[in-house]
Amino acid sequence: MAAITAALVKELRERTGEGMMDCKKALEKAGGDIEKAIDDMRASGAIKAAKKAGNVAAEGAIAVKTDGKSAVLLEVNSQTDFLALQDDFKNFVAESLEEAFAQKLTDAAPLIASREAAREALVAKCGENVNIRRLVRVEGDVVGAYLHGNKIGAVVVLKGGDVELAKNIAMHVAASNPEFLDASEISAEAIEREKNVFLQLNADKIAGKPGNIVENMINGRITKFKAEASLKEQAFVMNPEVKVGELAKKAGAEIVSFTYFKVGEGIEKPVDDFAAEVAAQVAAAKQ
């Protein structure tokens, strides 16, 4: 059995990120064999990762890579924004993005499978749940991408135009988050819902007004809704005097598609109620 020196403990700590006492115990259990200690700690980490799998990971980062003809947009989640700013997490995201782009992956499932060992190692080291949530790959004549910090990302596919135009429109998408490409994609159901919402919110204003006046008010709201919801009808953020669709048309381009990712979008975060938690603990203690 090799002597458990301070230098050996320090090396194991640097290689694993675990605490000094944990490293010392692992080395003692492994008979001073640092590689075996690492294997044992990874095995222990895998168990720890499984226990944390139920924790809600709603923070994280968006990453994007493009070559002008294709792009991959990726979301990786963590439990806290603090972890999302750490190098270990950033490296995991970057390596995952590179793999997805190089292998031309169109779905997150194969990436999740191939990155599972690295994910478990990261979870074991940081003590937080980490998940590869989703990815999208797009291809086209011209592809542009924009990343706002590490929280919002967008990609745009054009037919015609250039990468700079596609990037500028992607920046607009990141800022405005349109629901549809153009007004023709808006379903009758969506329009009916908007109409009903308008009527409910303005019941007092329209009470007693002639039917044609009410109809004009509804039509005005629906027109505004279509402009707000569809990318081509929105005022371009860099020049509100022109619509996004007009901008593309003037450049000899057609917007084919867009994709928008925001960290944690659609993930329900738990709401901690400290008072309720204490009350529950007191009630349990009385039983």
Curated annotation (Swiss-Prot):
Function: Associates with the EF-Tu.GDP complex and induces the exchange of GDP to GTP. It remains bound to the aminoacyl-tRNA.EF-Tu.GTP complex up to the GTP hydrolysis stage on the ribosome.
Stretch list, region Involved in Mg(2+) ion dislocation from EF-Tu: 80-83
Listed Pfam families: EF_TS
Taxonomy of the source species: Bacteria, Pseudomonadati, Pseudomonadota, Gammaproteobacteria, Pseudomonadales
GO cellular component: cytoplasm
Example GO molecular function: translation elongation factor activity
Family under the similarity heading: Belongs to the EF-Ts family.
Record carries keyword Protein biosynthesis: yes
Subcellular location: Cytoplasm
Alphabetized HAMAP family for the sequence: EF_Ts (MF_00050)
Keyword list, A-Z: Cytoplasm, Elongation factor, Protein biosynthesis
Protein name, per record: Elongation factor Ts
Xref: NCBIfam families: tsf
